[in-house]
């Protein structure tokens, strides 16, 4: 039986197609892994890649991804709506099939150490790989973004796990870790007022007293003149997609706006979508393990 893990690295480039393809080709050069998907957002100026494959080869694929980002992306010239602190901003590893979380943690440490030793980019371990409770949350690590990192890394609480207390001059710093599958979900509103998106994001995110397992910010999509609630769901089994969507819809109505569209970034676990379909279709006596064709084929 094949053993499979997933890696979903994010890079701080969403506009230059040549650079994005250069990074994609770096992943494709590694045998034993598959680049399943990659998507870019010009407003966020960010790309998300989904790689799956053999655990032994995934460490090499993640490193080559990071190396390509360091070679091609200059954070001193980067501007975008999405928070970021590095050229390769985050590298998460997720167990998929017959791989324990502990193995993903070890892979994350191996990759983090190599990024520092060979690329000179400091690394902070996060989520399940974190070395202290306050370092689990990516948003806390990234707070202040690239511009504030030189000062932040002088604080002993935020010393990198690999590297010294200085950021890479053009590549910044990267978070590497192991985690549960994440659902990246964006909801677009019928308004150009980004403050409304900010208020809704604050209401729904866990850090402000909202829903557990939800991280959210408001962003402005300049090209579409549309405000967006950008959401990361860190445990879709505890806080499902439909609940987040309905809460945003309810909160938007307070401001006289409605949802005009939504998008999923990257690959999403099948169960997350099946659960959403079950809710909206009001299915009775539905058995997802026996009534979903793909469950019998996988």
Give the location of each predicted region.
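Long, contiguous binding/interaction regions
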Residues: 1-298
């Amino acid at each position: 039986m094949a053993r499979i893990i997933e890696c979903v690295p994010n890079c701080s480039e969403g506009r230059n197609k040549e650079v994005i393809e250069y990074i994609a080709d770096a992943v494709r050069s590694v045998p034993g892994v598959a680049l399943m998907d990659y998507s870019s957002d010009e407003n966020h100026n960010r790309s998300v890649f989904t790689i799956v494959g053999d655990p032994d080869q995934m460490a090499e694929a993640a490193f080559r991804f990071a190396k390509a980002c360091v070679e091609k992306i200059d954070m001193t010239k980067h501007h975008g709506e999405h928070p970021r602190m590095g050229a390769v901003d985050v590298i998460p590893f997720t167990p998929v099939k017959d791989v324990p979380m502990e193995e993903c943690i070890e892979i994350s440490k191996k990759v983090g150490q190599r990024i520092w030793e060979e690329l000179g980019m400091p690394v902070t371990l996060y989520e399940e790989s974190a070395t202290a409770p306050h370092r689990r949350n990516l948003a806390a690590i990234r707070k202040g973004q690239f511009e504030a990192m030189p000062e932040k890394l002088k604080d002993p609480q935020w010393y990198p796990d690999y590297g010294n207390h200085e950021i890479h001059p053009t590549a910044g710093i990267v978070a590497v870790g192991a985690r549960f599958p994440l659902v990246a979900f964006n909801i677009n509103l019928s308004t150009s007022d980004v403050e409304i998106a900010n208020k809704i994001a604050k209401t729904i995110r866990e850090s402000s007293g909202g829903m557990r397992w939800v991280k959210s910010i408001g962003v402005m999509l300049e090209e579409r003149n549309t405000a967006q609630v950008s959401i990361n769901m860190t445990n879709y089994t505890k806080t499902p997609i439909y609940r987040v969507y309905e809460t945003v819809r309810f909160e938007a109505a307070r401001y006289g706006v409605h949802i005009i569209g939504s998008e999923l970034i990257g690959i999403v676990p099948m169960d997350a979508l099946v659960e959403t379909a079950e809710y909206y279709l009001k299915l009775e006596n539905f058995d997802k393990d026996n009534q979903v064709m793909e469950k019998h084929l996988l």
